[in-house]
Amino acid sequence: MKHLFRGLLLVAVILCCNFQQAFAQQMPPIPIDKNVRIGKLDNGLTYYIRKNNLPANRADFYIAQKVGSIQEEENQRGLAHFLEHMCFNGTTHFPGDALKQYLERIGVKFGENLNAYTAIDETVYNISNVPVKTPGAVDSCLLILHDWSNDLTLDPKEIDKERGVINEEWRTRMSAMMRMQE
């Protein structure tokens, strides 16, 4: 009798688990704020613009690219992250250190207001707290976003300098256990 009861209980649990899957529903998408202007350029870039009054006379610029470590082949591991770093080391319109120098001159601090990250499926660059009343600041930030998406200079000297930065960043992120296992 005990075995029969356990068997029936096991069947009931399995059936409940299967029915739960049948009733699972996909969550509806998050609604887009009606104050967001959305458009698509001829080159396929989708943009989102929203006015924000706080902080006053400041703007944030982001470009999210649908590329990350998931697209890399084994012999390309770390390339997306490396290119993210190279975006700050020279573009067509901002050679060498000119991008960082210009933005810091108008009050955008590297690391705090000027940054990027690479994830599994995206690489996101941001310039925040840009003083919009500074002549040319908005146009320059849009030009920087353009350069980040299409016009890196990839100067061999800058590549060699950044290689050491990437290696050090990787080393410090590894846990002590991972280092011991190598």
Question: Where on the chain are the PLM-derived regions?
Answer:
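Boundary at the C-terminal end of the N-terminal hydrophobic targeting segment
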Residues: 22-24
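Generic detector of short alpha-helix boundary/capping microenvironments
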Residues: 12, 31-32, 113
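Residue-level signature of the cytosolic catalytic core of signaling kinases
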Residues: 28, 32, 41, 72-75, ...
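Active-site-adjacent, His/Asp/Glu-enriched structural segments that form or flank metal-binding
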Residues: 55-57, 65-80, 84-182
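Mature N-terminal segment immediately following signal peptide/propeptide cleavage
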Residues: 29-63
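Bacterial N-terminal signal peptides
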Residues: 7-18
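Positively charged n-region of N-terminal signal peptides that target proteins for export
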Residues: 1-6
